[in-house]
C-alpha cells in the first residue's frame, strides 16, 4: 500500500468516526443543574488540525482527555452570568 493510499484510508476513517481533540482548558460548568462542562479543545487530526474550539461536554472530563468530535465547525457560546 502506497503512502497516498494510506493517507486516504486514514482520512476516511477520521471522517467516519470523528475528529480527535485534546482538552487543554476547563472553563466552567453550565446547564440547569451544572451537568455540562465547557472546555477548550485542540483538534489533533483532520482539516482543522491545530484549531482551538470551545465545546460543551457532558460527563466527567479532565485536562489532557481526548474527545472525539463529530464535526469541528460549531463552537459553544460564551457563558454569561445572569444579573
UniProtKB/Swiss-Prot annotation:
InterPro entries: NA-bd_OB-fold, Ribosomal_eS28, Ribosomal_eS28_CS. It comes from the Archaea. One of its GO terms (biological process) is ribosomal small subunit assembly. Keywords: Ribonucleoprotein, Ribosomal protein. Coiled coil: none annotated. The keyword Ribosomal protein applies. One of its GO terms (molecular function) is structural constituent of ribosome. It holds the Pfam family Ribosomal_S28e. GO terms for cellular component: cytosolic small ribosomal subunit. The keyword Ribosomal protein applies. PANTHER family: 40S RIBOSOMAL PROTEIN S28, SMALL RIBOSOMAL SUBUNIT PROTEIN ES28. Belongs to the eukaryotic ribosomal protein eS28 family. This is Small ribosomal subunit protein eS28. It comes from Sulfurisphaera tokodaii (strain DSM 16993 / JCM 10545 / NBRC 100140 / 7) (Sulfolobus tokodaii).
